[in-house]
Amino acid sequence: EVFKILNYLKKKKINYLDTASAYNQSEAKIGKYFQKTNKKFRVITKFSFKGNNSIEKQFIKSLHLLGYLPDTILAHNYRDYINPKFHEQIKNIKKKYLIKNIGVSLNKISELNKILKYKKPDVIQVPLNILNKSFLDENIIKRLKKKSIRILGRSIFLQGLFYKDKKFVFKKFKNVKKKYMQLLKIASHEKMTLGELSLVWANHLKDVDNIILGVDNFPHLKKNLDSLKKRISKESYNLIKKINLENNKITKPYLWKKQ
């Protein structure tokens, strides 16, 4: 099924794949596809200092599994990015393998401020969905564009939460019902699921360079790509703009396990 998915992505002219050194199986399968078809994607991969392996060792392992040089390397989190060892090792990798872009995956604005004080990245990967628009703040966008930093949006479906029953959502998270119901009403008006609404909305944000979608299987991928043909009315777009729960735990998956 992996070959079917990757062939379909090529057919649809989607040229980026997002992976990570932690996803060994994923990198190995992508590598087999490259080897057998000679069709290449531009690969974004992430590395972290978790465990004893250096970034360089992880990179060599990923390179072996992929059989192909990644286009972009990201620090898995801001702590890794502001670690001098990360840049020391990345400098060696960049020089030896001519890697184009170095960046970082972030969770919140305070992390952005810390990494910008330390060293400008080429790219940042940030959470982005109809409940969390924190990185779309006009001043932040201007700041990033001025520094020519590319923005990649992830967590479009809020870790799959937008496909859960609303009763589950209201039971798990406090003080979300009113705004969540407003979004469900907009989705209903646009004849979409909440997940589709978030995807179509994110795909049409002019300030975001690329969006990242997780793929469970081929039907899931096809459904998501078909959804991209849809449009949201200007009225609904403006309503979505006013709704946010950025300060609520619902938009912070990294805190969910602590509940």
Explain the meaning of each model-derived region.
Residues 40-51, 72-76:
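A short, structured active-site edge motif that brings together acidic residues
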Residues 77-243, 250:
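Beta/alpha (TIM)-barrel catalytic core signal, keyed to glycine-rich beta->alpha loops juxtaposed to Asp/Glu
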Residues 1-9, 52-66, 107-114:
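Short, acidic/polar
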Residues 20-28, 49-54, 79-84, 131-135:
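Acidic-and-aromatic substrate-binding clefts and catalytic sites of carbohydrate-active enzymes
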Residues 56-74, 92-96, 117:
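CE4/NodB-like, metal-dependent polysaccharide N-deacetylase domain
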Residues 1-41:
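N-terminal binding-site loop/beta-alpha segment at the start of enzyme catalytic domains
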Residues 31-39, 60-68, 115-119, 144-146:
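Acidic (Asp/Glu)-rich catalytic clusters
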Residues 19, 30, 45, 104, ...:
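Hydrophobic residues in well-ordered beta-strands that form the structural core
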